[in-house]
Structures are given as structure tokens and as C-alpha cells.
Amino acid sequence: MRAARAAPLLQLLLLLGPWLEAAGVAESPLPAVVLAILARNAEHSLPHYLGALERLDYPRARMALWCATDHNVDNTTEMLQEWLAAVGDDYAAVVWRPEGEPRFYPDEEGPKHWTKERHQFLMELKQEALTFARNWGADYILFADTDNILTNNQTLRLLMGQGLPVVAPMLDSQTYYSNFWCGITPQGYYRRTAEYFPTKNRQRRGCFRVPMVHSTFLASLRAEGADQLAFYPPHPNYTWPFDDIIVFAYACQAAGVSVHVCNEHRYGYMNVPVKSHQGLEDERVNFIHLILEALVDGPRMQASAHVTRPSKRPSKIGFDEVFVISLARRPDRRERMLASLWEMEISGRVVDAVDGWMLNSSAIRNLGVDLLPGYQDPYSGRTLTKGEVGCFLSHYSIWEEVVARGLARVLVFEDDVRFESNFRGRLERLMEDVEAEKLSWDLIYLGRKQVNPEKETAVEGLPGLVVAGYSYWTLAYALRLAGARKLLASQPLRRMLPVDEFLPIMFDQHPNEQYKAHFWPRDLVAFSAQPLLAAPTHYAGDAEWLSDTETSSPWDDDSGRLISWSGSQKTLRSPRLDLTGSSGHSLQPQPRDEL
């Protein structure tokens, strides 16, 4: 069901407001809005949350802040105080409602446990915010959870422009989770529908009527029936679960107020809630992953400059070096990769990739490079490309440095890595387990495309590891000194093929016996993380996909002609992967709406 459009006058004001202000015309009478901020143990997300609120393209003189915080065991209160001291005077009104004690609810098992008392207190707070907005004379109130980051600075204008009584901007997450339901049972529980995934994945776009929105939504206080909306106490006839989001959904239904979700635009991100037995560290790790997803998919999150953030302490996480192979002419990839490592507190060192575009056939031969006799791409049948030569030489230079410096073990990343959830923690645990089991290894894939996963065997005593089979990609791997020596000793430049075909030859898992016959010994000891810890940022067919190895010239062609080798299936998304949207995600959804 499509929504009615906003009143023409309001649409015009929302559209012309920024231009009128820039031209020095008196500020247009835009609707007054209350931003309701309810924070508990939100130190990990507050800087980005507040930064997003600061960047909303809406006159602060037409906005009021209603801010409450309670039951904190972190620095949430101090952060909010610091932020309000810096920006509060810019807003039309500020309500500050902190509670320092108690720090816990009596019956809670942990800070993420939702007890009945906690639900009631939250409903009372939201009702206070709603009452303040009405008394202040606001036209709208925006509720936005503190781990919901509105990266689209036009969010308020876009939502108001729909002219709807209750409307939510659809937010993206690390999983299938979002801030709306498409179905609800007569008892007030979540009901699965055929419409949810097409809406969540934006296969259908627009504003759609739904039974519930939560976490972030805009409510009009001038709409018909809006005066009957309430969080607490629940409606006299209320028998549904005692939960603030369900109570409000019932209130909307009882008042005849329609609820919509809009997904025509990318509005921002929301963190997937952790389970009740998990803690703040789990939530922090999840939010870091959300930041990384935003770095890939955009728009990026930007932290407020008005709050003091916990300092980062990057390290090499037990490796002697962390290499990042990156083309100098792809600065966006390089910057994103370094920003991702910084968020995970991993200290990486950029290695300028050998650029295949800059190579000609004579330069390639002067480097001692020659093609492996008979090599053809396994799918397209093409020969080696200059991009693949550059990629191989880039990895080769790292292997040389490992041997020259005697580095015991290193990490190697290409610059198109999408990190899975808790990458650092999972990698650290994996390496600790490998050390504890005294496993002898040369190379461990962290990201790859498995060709025959059903033929791979688990490593006894190491549930997160399998013996690597034939694989594509070299986007992320760990390498030991002994492994680097074996790779160099095989003298691969004299019989080159793509590096992701060379590695399986060296651990004797390549299916082509003719290729393997050129290399001996094939004794590289290779394993792989399972589940994988990294994936490509994009795949062939994605709008943002770009490959400097697949879109390239044949290795001995100096005509400057670029060919996109669409016949290769290496860069396609694996049909075995359970994916959502444009990327694979490692978190399993644990939303509060699965009641």
C-alpha cells in the first residue's frame, strides 16, 4: 500500500528550506521536532549516534532535545553531558534527565536482560518524552535508539515529506533484522510474511503500511488520532506482551493511526540486539562490525567531534607484520581498509601493489616472468592477464620480505576485504587454539572461495579449522616463515599462473595434473578458517564490483586494450553462501521481535 503524499505547502517548505537559509531569507517556519534520546550503556555507539544527529539537515532552532539516561555501568552519562554542553545552546530547548543510581535492575541477569521492570521504566520514559513534546507544542517527535545511526542527513525532511502519522526510515543491519514488522498475530507476536524480505532487501521500494515500526520512527503530533497515542500506561484493553514497541503498536491500532516504513532511500544503520545473557563487550563488537559494514556499503558513519572517545590501541595481534596490498590508484579502497583495521585496533602496513596497467610485455620478461605452459582460466579459457601478473608479484614481494626479515608469521590482506563479525576476536581465538594444539602449518586461509567444500575435512581438536581444498582468491591469509620459503623455492615467476591457482598447487590440491607437474615438492601445509573470517567486498554482478585482474589485458598484449573477462566464475557469489542484500553476513539475527 502506497502512502498519501505530504501537503504541498509542507513539501515546498522542506524542499526550499536550505536554499532560503543560504540566501539569507528569514528562516522558513518548518515544523518543530523533539528528538527523544534514551540511552543506557551506550558508550560504544553514542559518538556515532550523536554525530549523526548533529548532521541532520534541519534547523536546530526548530528542534528540542529530550535526553534521559539511567542504569549505566559505562561512561554514557559523561558522554551525554559533554555533548549537551557543546551543542545544547544551539537547540530550541533541552531536557536533561539523568539517573546515576541504581546501576542495575533488581532482577536482571545482565545489562542486556529485559525484565518487566526495565520495560515499564522505558515505557514511562518514552511517555514523558511524548508528553513533553505535546506540551512544548512540537509538530513531530523522533524516537531513535542510540545504536541506530542516521547517516542520511535528509532523514527528517524525507520522512516529513511523506505526510504520514507514524513513519520509520528502514534501517540496514548486519543481518535480516530491521526496524519494522510486516505481520503481527492477534496475540501481538511477530508473524512472518512474504513481504518482509522483498521490503528489507529493497526489491520493492516505497512507503508501505505495516503493523509495527520500532527503534527509530517519526510520529506526527498533529495527525488525526495522534492525541491517543501512548506508551504508558498501556491501553485499557491491552493484553499483548508487555514490551514498549508492542504497546505502542497496539496504541496506534486502537487509535486508527496508520504506521508505515519507507525504504526508497538509504537512511542509516541499526545494530542487531545481542541475546539477554550477553554483555556490553558483545554489543561493542557487534557495533564495530556495523561500522565496518557502513565503510563498505556506505554512507559511512561519522563520530561527533564533541565527545571524548575511548582511545584506540592498534597492535599486530600476535603477528610479526600485517600487510595490506593496495594499488596506489585505488585510494578509496586503501583508505577504507586502513579505517577498518583501525576500528578493529589492528596495525596494518600498506604495500603498494604492482600495477598491471603499468606493465608491458618486455618489463614482465625482464622480471623473469614467463607463463606456465598451457595455462588457461578454468572458466573463460583466457590466458593470464597483466592484472594477474601484478597481483602475483605483489604477493611474491611480501613472501620475499618475510624470508629476508625472518618474520615468523604474518597476515596478508588484499584491499577488497569485507570482514566478518568479530574478525579480530575470532582470529585471535583461532590462533590461540592452533598454538595450543601445536599444529604444524604453513598457510591458513581467512577468506577464499571454496570449490568443493564437501570434500574438505575438519582438523581434529580444532573445530574452527579445515584442511584446505582447491580454492579461489587470496584476499586474506596467515603465512609462516616456512611457508614463504616453500613458495619462493618453487620459483613460480618462471612458470606463472594466477596466485590463487598457484597456492592450491603448492598444497597439492589443484585438479589439473599438468599444472602440478611443473612444481615439486608440493608440500605446503595449508588450512582454512571455517567458517571463513573474510569475504570480498563485492562480487561480479554487483553495481560496485571492480576487478583489476578480470578487467585487464592479456599478459603479452601491449595494445593497451582492456577486456572484461565476464566468462570467469571465480568472482561470482557462491550459491552455497547464505547471503542477504549485497553482502554476506556472519551474525545470526537475535531481535527482540522474535517474542
From Swiss-Prot:
Keyword Glycoprotein: yes
Signal peptide segment: 1-22
Keywords: Cell adhesion, Endoplasmic reticulum, Glycoprotein, Signal
Comp. bias regions, Polar residues: 580-589
One GO location term (cellular component): plasma membrane
Family: Belongs to the glycosyltransferase 25 family.
Name the UniProt record assigns to this protein: Inactive glycosyltransferase 25 family member 3
Species in which this protein is naturally found: Homo sapiens
